[in-house]
Amino acid sequence: GEQDVRRAARPWLAVLDAVGTGTTLTAAGYLPPALVEQIAQATGVTEWWIGKANREDLTWPVAELRAAAEQVGLLRKAKGTVTPTARARAVAGHPRELVAAVLARLPMGRGSDVEAGWFALLGLAAGQSGATLDAGVAQILTDRGWRTHAGSDLSAAQAHQGARPTLDALDSMAGGREHVDPSLVTRLARAALFGITATA
């Protein structure tokens, strides 16, 4: 429903609202402290984060969300600035279209990470989660020929690490770290695979 859509759009809108038409990064390449704090408050990170939540290099939930926004094509980083993409500007005022645009870019990563993300989406859509999901993804990746650098089968922890950017994006859309709604994660995974209209 619309409540789910608004919740799923919340983290991405928080980043887009903070960045506005574009912002200059610090000399070290981070978001300015005021914007980090704004994003942390808008996404609920400040409810559980220990510390000020105003430096991106020390506030990993905000840093990861910004990186995810770049990976799913909402932000573009170039020449010391970060700006919303044309796609982001087109959907920013429309939560459903924004969520659909993000889901269309899942899974995230390259190589085995993308495959881990795909199989994690399939598992989540089928209602799997946690250790069961990680073990299943590891087995599928191993069956498909992926190996560690040492040549051994992939572990559940390695499969989870590969799928993590995709899993984290879904968790942030389903209420965030401390308030994740597992049923919404399942619905979002299905929407990522089959389209938002098929599951909303």
List where the protein language model places each region:
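Short, amphipathic alpha-helical interface elements at domain boundaries
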Residues: 1-58
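Leucine-rich, amphipathic alpha-helical/linker segments
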Residues: 1-19, 95-143, 200
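Charged, alpha-helical interface segments at or near domain boundaries
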Residues: 52, 60, 64-72
